[in-house]
Amino acid sequence: MKKLTSNDVTPEEIFYQRRKIIKAFGLSAVATALPTFSFAQESSDLKALEYKKSTESTLILTPENKVTGYNNFYEFGVDKGSPAHYAKKFQVNPWKLEIGGEVENPFTLNYDQLFTQFPLEERIYRFRCVEAWAMVVPWIGFELNKLLEKAKPTSKAKYVVFHTLYDPEQMPGQKNHFFGGGIHYPYVEALTLAEAMHSLTLMSVGLYGKALAPQNGAPIRLVVPWKYGFKSIKSIVKITLSETRPRTTWESLAPNEYGFYANVNPKVDHPRWSQASERVIGAGGLLRVKRQPTLMFNGYEREVAHLYKGLDLRINY
């Protein structure tokens, strides 16, 4: 994995929103009418976690207020600051995470068990959005394979499907089709079983030493560091192992723009922008945007390239 230097620190900057995407669906007037907020839930309100701290990474972390204040979570609005504003009162306790489908041992975890069922550890990962911006985040969680091993997938299990909470009373983007970016909720994502079992794939319950803020996907979210951020589904309530591949949310909304695999790939551009480079959030100053080359698989090529042996990644994007 390529090491980042002190020049790769990623404080926040104001840059392009996914309004280009929204315009494609005729929602630009609504999107531009939405306010932009820059404040997030106070970190002091969040539960401190016990976890094994990372001692190996040399990546330079994104400042905490940038990670919690610049988010895509359309259930709470399409502007980057909207999730931090509209998710302030989002209730994550009680919570229920159901694991089922093609498994021998279906089970359910409650809120407290999300933090105690498996030992927690810190993983410092690059985070790459499909919008061509990047951060470095100190996630806290457990490997998804630990949860799957407990569930005991059957021989029919080929895919792992994730569902976000559906609660329009708490999530205004689910209640208002336009406010939520035109998405048909609940949000659905999926991985192949091999991807889900990989040791880099994380179920995160926290960052920066504390439980996740609502805008970051509390109380539990997926983190797949070699894929674009929309694959790392937030506020998960159901995990189902399936024999067949589902149609995921962005794949359903714009299949020519968002594929199932969504691996970070500098050689495969989005139809409306290049993926060859990425903006480092906040670096470069007010009048200058810092860009850096995009790394294949977001810098995790050595660890995950074997998962796609024989697969044409230009077609299977």
UniProtKB/Swiss-Prot annotation:
Biological process annotations from GO: protein repair
Keyword Calcium appears in the UniProt entry: no
Signal peptide (from-to) = 1-40
Which Gene3D superfamilies did the record assign? Oxidoreductase, molybdopterin-binding domain
Q: What is known about its processing and modification?
A: Predicted to be exported by the Tat system. The position of the signal peptide cleavage has not been experimentally proven.
Q: Which UniProt keywords apply?
A: Metal-binding, Molybdenum, Oxidoreductase, Periplasm, Signal
Q: What is this protein called?
A: Protein-methionine-sulfoxide reductase catalytic subunit MsrP
Native organism taxonomy: Bacteria, Pseudomonadati, Pseudomonadota, Gammaproteobacteria, Pasteurellales
Quote the gene name from the UniProt entry.
msrP
